[in-house]
């Protein structure tokens, strides 16, 4: 676009107007493409939010959202780690095989939750980037 814009700057009269119209048409096409990407990203964000809520409910927690942002992230993740610590304390100084399985299952759920949060954040950031480009 910059080269076309610089070329248009050197022109005058009807030639300049024609070149500016070409630039405008190209920009409108780009905006439509970005808007289509944004719409698709919004669809993925809904899916990511469902996945995030599913992973959270597996840990008996829930997130609240404010304009797409997770508004209770700190408190919720603190409660998740507190649950893990409470489970560890309940086992005492030694952990048997059954207790280790419980801990591993909890750790797996926590990892799934963290992955879901990361995916949600990436999609939300993509939408913000597309908004800035539009």
What are these regions (language model features)?
Residues 22, 29, 65-68, 72, ...:
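A structural signal for alpha-helical segments
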Residues 1-33:
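Short, charge-rich amphipathic alpha-helices with coiled-coil/heptad character
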Residues 1-3, 125-134:
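Short acidic DE-rich linear segments
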Residues 35-73, 80:
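Extended alpha-helical coiled-coil "stalk/arm" regions
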Residues 27-42, 47, 86-122:
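Long amphipathic alpha-helical coiled-coil segments
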């Amino acid at each position: 676009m910059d080269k076309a814009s610089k070329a248009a700057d050197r022109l005058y009269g009807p030639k300049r107007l024609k070149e500016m119209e070409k630039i405008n048409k190209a920009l409108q096409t780009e905006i439509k493409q970005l808007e289509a990407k944004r719409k698709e990203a919004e669809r993925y964000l809904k899916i990511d939010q469902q996945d995030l809520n599913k992973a959270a409910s597996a840990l008996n927690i829930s997130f609240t959202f404010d304009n797409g942002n997770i508004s209770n992230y700190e408190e919720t993740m603190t409660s998740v780690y507190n649950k893990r610590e409470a489970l560890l304390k309940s086992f005492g100084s030694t952990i048997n095989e059954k207790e280790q399985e419980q801990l591993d299952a909890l750790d797996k759920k926590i990892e799934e939750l963290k992955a879901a949060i990361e995916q949600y954040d990436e999609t939300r950031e993509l939408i913000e980037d597309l908004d800035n480009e539009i």
